[in-house]
Amino acid sequence: MNKKDILELKRRFKKEACTFTRLCGCYVDADRNKITTFGETFLNLEEEEFYKYLEIAKKVLSGTLGNNILNLEFPLEEEGSGGKQQFLMGLRASALKNEELMEAFFDLVIDNYSYAGNYLILVYHDAYDVMTKTSDNNKLDESEEVYEYLLCAICPVALSKPGLGYREDENRIGPRIRDWVVGVPDTGFVFPAFSDRSTDIHSCMFYTKDAKAPHNEFVESGLGCNSKFTATEQKLTFQNIVKDVIGEDDAESEALFLDIHDNLNNLIPFTEDETAEPEPIPVTPSTISSVLSESGVPDDKAQVIEKTYENIFGEEVPIAEHLVDPKLLEVNAKRKEKLELVHQVENLKQQLEETRSVPVEDGEDDVPATKTYDVILRVKPEKVEQIHSQIINGQKCLVIPMDENEHAAVNGINTTV
């Protein structure tokens, strides 16, 4: 599923376009006990409930593709008899009306979802009549196929915050009654996937709210798919690989680490169109080798980083965009700006020193030097009495009479008068 596929589904989650046929749910406590289960025709829900459940469904299709949203493929063994994919196919075919299948699904989630607290399992059934589109994306009034799918959302349920409130039955302000509130989804999935505006029964879309710690136990045991790194996991893992080798306790290591990020960012093609998706650039071990070399990482350390990188990521090669941390790019830009300012200040100091350095003849070391005057004269004692001021062409001037063949130096430049 790409961004267009996800947005096409998500845009339909509103009152006038929604086609959800049924909603089923199971409320589970912290001890994994089923507190209650329910099943409803979606369009029969009360208006407030209708919109709340729609908001939950939208959240499962929210976030960044490759980070919060992952495309997962089913292994061949899961597509055979008794496999997870076959079970989900049967659940979809039942349109959530088979109670035994629903109970089996809830048990599957409870047994394979690790969460310390109460939560609500929600499953939606939908049948989307996919309209044919022309090459310029205009819809034609004819059906291309019916995309029938399940959307599952697993939402944490927590007590509302304590506080004071108006107790109407007692007509006073007192402790507010705390109740259990359903939160936004922590985990979810869509089966089958909607790829290139068509049903893909060999794949599903997985959603995680926390990209740093997705529920891989549910991916592997609940859905029967191989877990994948999120973009956040790839970025943090790569940073740890580099820091473990080059260190992070001194300024030199930090500068090297930041330069590696800059060079990775240079791999990403620049585009002025902010809506356009950047072309994914795979960062293979050989690419890492080039980046490390360009950044000035010593060969022995570079080899360790490359080997560890290849062992951890294997065939699941990250793209450059997933490894780059915008915050670190900003830090490095400020660091380079500061270094450039320091360099400019040093150059200015050197230029000032050269400008102010005027040769002093022997015996004149006792002449007081000061930087508060615009003009500083150093002359032989016998010429002091000859110096006088005079108005010339309306301009006040300092006149120093010069004898034939006398020499003068102005700002260190020798002049013969």
Named regions from a protein language model:
Residues 23, 27, 119, 410-414:
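General "foldedness" signal
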Residues 29-365:
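Long, hydrophobic alpha/beta structural blocks
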Residues 367-368, 378-417:
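Extended, charge-rich low-complexity regions and/or helical-solenoid scaffolds
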Residues 373-377:
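C-terminal helix-loop subdomains that flank or include functional centers
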Residues 7:
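Active-site-proximal "nucleotidyltransferase
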Residues 1-4:
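Phospho-regulated, Ser/Thr/Pro-rich intrinsically disordered or coiled-coil terminal scaffolds
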Residues 10-31:
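Leu/Val/Ala/Ile-rich N-terminal alpha-helices, chiefly Sec-type signal peptides and the beginnings
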